A protein has these predicted regions:
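N-terminal secretory signal peptides that target proteins for export/translocation
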Residues: 1-2
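Bacterial N-terminal signal peptides
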Residues: 5-16
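N-terminal "domain-start" segment that seeds a small globular fold
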Residues: 18-42
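Conserved segment of the thioredoxin-like fold in thiol-based oxidoreductases
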Residues: 26-28, 64, 71-114, 119, ...
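Short pre-active-site segment immediately N-terminal to redox-active cysteine/selenocysteine motifs
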Residues: 48-50, 54-58, 124
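Hydrophobic beta-strand anchors of alpha/beta hydrolase catalytic cores
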Residues: 51-52, 83, 128
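Conserved redox-active cysteine motifs that mediate thiol-disulfide chemistry
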Residues: 54-71
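Thiol/disulfide oxidoreductase modules built on the thioredoxin-like
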Residues: 97-105, 112-157
Length: 162
């Protein structure tokens, strides 16, 4: 009984830590087409804190998270915060249609061949990577549950102060 309880406690601790982890190393560079048809490059944003959010319209947590990402963008964009939402679906038309109903003002990029999501080793939807001003990856989040946006805000504020 004690062994089973110990395994359960360890499992809960590991699971609670799995959704957010610190990272080190340079963020892989990429250039993708935005919904406006522009080419957007991560390298062009060096000097800003950048959130790269991988999402899909079929992902319910991704859709739940989107308004919170918009609020974060509105609050911190003028302070040097950028947000790139990378849609990973084969056909971007579904994402375009969904975005008509859920407007966001940050850049939405399309990765229909999943090349960028593979560079970032995306294993869950949504996955969110925070990149510091110097271009290094600092945090990664796998999945989304209500309340995660508070952790995003804490991490974005810390990176903006660096």
């Amino acid at each position: 009984m004690l062994r089973a309880f110990s395994v359960l406690v360890v499992g809960i601790l590991v699971a609670s830590l799995a959704w957010a982890a610190q990272l080190t190393g340079p963020a892989p560079g990429f250039t993708l087409t935005s919904r406006d048809g522009d080419q957007v490059s991560l390298a062009e944003l060096k000097g800003n804190v950048v959130m790269v959010n991988f999402w899909a319209t079929w992902c319910v947590p991704c859709r739940q998270e989107m308004p919170h990402l918009q609020a974060l963008y509105e609050r911190y964009n003028s302070l040097g915060f950028e947000l790139l939402a990378v849609n990973v679906e084969d056909d971007p038309e579904g994402a375009r249609a969904w975005l008509e109903e859920t407007p966001v003002t940050f850049p939405v990029l399309f990765d229909p061949k999943n090349e960028v999501s593979q560079l970032y080793k995306v294993v869950a939807m949504p996955s969110t990577v925070l990149v510091a001003r110097d271009g290094t990856m600092r945090f990664i989040h796998h999945g989304y549950k209500p309340g995660y946006e508070n952790e995003y805000q804490t991490q974005v504020r810390a990176l903006l102060r660096e």
